[in-house]
Amino acid sequence: MILSTVGYHWEEAFGAYDEFRNGGWDVALFTVDGSPPKVDPTSLKRTGPLSWFGFGVSKANSPESPRGRELMAAIEGLRPLSDLDPSAIDALYLPGGHGCLFDVNRSEALHGVIGELHRNGKPLSGVCHATSTYAFVEADGRPIVAGKRFTGFPGFVDTIMSSTGLVQREFLPIPFSNDQALADAGAKLSWRNKLLAALNPRYTRVDWPFVTGMGPKAARGVAREIIRSQRHTYPE
C-alpha cells in the first residue's frame, strides 16, 4: 500500500487494510520517498450518517478504533518505495485522496514497480483519485490500461466539490482530472460508468489484473476481490 505525503484519504487506506488483515494478509506500507504520510483532514471528520457515503468517518472506522490504532502503528514503521521488492508482494493497492495526484500518481519509481508487477501478472488495484496512477504506465509502448474497464473518482464530481468548498485549499487547483487521465490512456470509462460511480459509493470494476473502486466505501470491496483472486486463478 502506497500512501501520499500530500494527503491520503483515511478510510480508503483503513477499509482495505482492515479487509486484508481480516483475510490473514500482511500489509506493507510505503510512501514514495519514505517521508511520513499526511492524512486529508476532511476524511477524519465525524459526519454521522454522511459517513455512509464516504464523507468523513464513523467511529468504527476511525484512527481511535482498535484496527485504526493498528494501522497508525504500521504507518509509523512505513518504508520508502525504494525498499519495495515487487517479487515479494502478492498485489498492489493504492488508496486515493486528492493528495495522491501530487506525488503518488506521477511517481516514475512507482510506475517502474507497477510495470514489473504487471509483467508478472500480479493484481493491481486502487480507489478514487489513485486509479489514474496506472494510466501513466506502459508496456510494449502501449498504456497498460488501454481497453480495460476502470472506475475512480469522477471528474465532474471533483468540479462540483471544488466549486462548493468541499476540497481542501491545499489541493487546489487540482493538477489533473483522474478520469480524463485514464480516458486519454485508453481505459474504458463511459458516462454510464461515471454516473453509476457517482450514485454508488461502493461501486467497483474488475478487469484483470485491475480492480478499481469509486471512493472510500469501495475500498473494502476492492480488497475482497484481491483476496478472492489469490484463492482462484483469475482470467487473462
Question: Which sequence ranges carry the predicted segments?
Answer:
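Extended, subdomain-level signal for the structured scaffold at the beginning of enzyme domains
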Residues: M1-N120, S132-E236
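Active-site cofactor/cluster-binding pocket
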Residues: P123
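Short, thiol/selenol-centered motifs that function as redox-active sites or metal-ligating centers
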Residues: G126-T131
